[in-house]
Amino acid sequence: MKGLLQRVRGARVEVAGEIVGAVDQGLLVLVAVEPSDTPESADKLLHKLLNYRVFSDDEGKMNLSLKDIDGGLLLVSQFTLAADTKSGLRPSFSTAAPPALGAALFDHLLLQAQQLHGKVASGRFGADMQVHLVNDGPVTFLLQT
């Protein structure tokens, strides 16, 4: 499972012109599920997302986690992040999980996040979404489980 996290001052996701998820300061995470992923992969990614120290402390060092600042977590499914881009000029999506597995594991990640953190929003799995964000830094990390 891959999670491309971006530290944001605010972010929202829209489907057909309707805002379906939004957060203020926190993390926007684009999530890709791969065929070998399991619920344990999702749990491991969530642990990292909640505890990864990407927010500045009083001295300007990245020492604080999402939990430390009580920030928002916006999860957005993005199967294209799992693409194989090693050869040719067109991405191959054979390395992405089938839609049923992707949806199940994304839902697992979302439900666990809601239980453990509280300030959680999401896009809509499989939908054509427009994501708006104010990237803070920018600070972006690719986490993989």
UniProtKB/Swiss-Prot annotation:
Cellular localisation: Cytoplasm
Function: An aminoacyl-tRNA editing enzyme that deacylates mischarged D-aminoacyl-tRNAs. Also deacylates mischarged glycyl-tRNA(Ala), protecting cells against glycine mischarging by AlaRS. Acts via tRNA-based rather than protein-based catalysis; rejects L-amino acids rather than detecting D-amino acids in the active site. By recycling D-aminoacyl-tRNA to D-amino acids and free tRNA molecules, this enzyme counteracts the toxicity associated with the formation of D-aminoacyl-tRNA entities in vivo and helps enforce protein L-homochirality.
Entry keyword set: Cytoplasm, Hydrolase, RNA-binding, tRNA-binding
GO biological process, one term: D-amino acid catabolic process
Similarity annotation: Belongs to the DTD family.
Gene: dtd
UniProt xrefs under InterPro entries: Daa-tRNA_deacyls_DTD, DTD-like_sf
Protein name: D-aminoacyl-tRNA deacylase
NCBIfam families named among the record's database cross-references: D-aminoacyl-tRNA deacylase
Subunit structure: Homodimer.
Superkingdom field: Bacteria
GO molecular function: D-tyrosyl-tRNA(Tyr) deacylase activity; Gly-tRNA(Ala) deacylase activity; Ser(Gly)-tRNA(Ala) hydrolase activity; tRNA binding
Domain comment in the entry: A Gly-cisPro motif from one monomer fits into the active site of the other monomer to allow specific chiral rejection of L-amino acids.
UniProt-listed Enzyme Commission number(s): 3.1.1.96
SUPFAM superfamilies noted in UniProt: DTD-like
Motif Gly-cisPro motif, important for rejection of L-amino acids positions after renumbering to this chain: 137-138
GO CC terms, sorted: cytoplasm
Catalytic activity line of the entry: glycyl-tRNA(Ala) + H2O = tRNA(Ala) + glycine + H(+); a D-aminoacyl-tRNA + H2O = a tRNA + a D-alpha-amino acid + H(+)
